[in-house]
């Protein structure tokens, strides 16, 4: 999913400078061919970033790659699209003040078409607005929903999955 979200950013956001990292570097190569810069490590990927977007396999990966190594620089907005539980979202929001949970609802087809559902959750109105503007690249405008907490975004995502 992360590849498709990054591809939408490259195609929809004029002038974006996008740095990507993947544990399996070959998986990031198509994005490099489309204009992204490949980082050798997560630390290199976030260096000088204005916004950091993660799309990982699950909450344990979020802890390992982002939270435990304290990857997010102070003041930098972190938008995480990983599917996590409400308790995980609360944990990440407590660990990183700039955390915005923005899980996506849908499969690769809607992702390629920019028609995903997205819940964007944070109590910070400015960060929520920023994240929603970015998520417009991969979201269906009628399914882009801002909520006031990371946990509420996680709940919305889980309920949407039940309806599928």
What are these regions (language model features)?
Residues 1, 62, 78-79, 131:
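Generic structural signal for conserved hydrophobic packing positions in ordered secondary structure
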Residues 35-39, 55, 72, 116-121, ...:
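Short, hinge-like loop/turn segments at secondary-structure boundaries
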Residues 47-48, 74, 115:
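Alpha-helix C-terminal capping/helix-to-coil transition sites in glycosyltransferase folds
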Residues 56-68:
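Glycine/threonine-rich flexible loop motifs
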Residues 1-54, 81-82, 91, 108-111, ...:
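NAD(P)+-binding Rossmann beta1-loop-alpha1 motif at the extreme N-terminus of oxidoreductases
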Residues 67, 84-162:
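Rossmann-fold dinucleotide-binding core
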Residues 69-75:
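Short, conserved loop/helix-junction motifs that constitute active-site signature segments
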């Amino acid at each position: 999913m992360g590849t498709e979200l990054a591809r939408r950013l490259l195609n929809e956001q004029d002038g974006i400078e996008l740095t990507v990292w993947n544990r399996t570097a070959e998986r990031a190569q198509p994005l490099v061919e489309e204009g992204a810069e490949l980082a050798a490590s997560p630390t290199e990927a976030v260096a000088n970033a204005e916004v950091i977007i993660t799309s990982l396999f699950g909450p344990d990966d979020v802890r390992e790659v982002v939270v435990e190594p304290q990857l997010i620089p102070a003041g930098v907005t972190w938008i995480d699209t990983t599917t996590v539980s409400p308790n995980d979202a609360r944990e990440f929001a407590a660990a990183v003040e700039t955390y915005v949970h923005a899980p996506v609802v849908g499969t690769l087809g809607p992702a390629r078409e920019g028609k995903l559902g997205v819940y964007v959750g944070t109590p910070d109105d400015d960060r929520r607005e920023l994240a929603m503007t970015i998520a417009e690249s991969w979201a269906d405008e009628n399914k882009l929903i801002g909520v006031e907490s990371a946990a509420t975004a996680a709940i919305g995502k889980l309920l949407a999955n039940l309806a599928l």
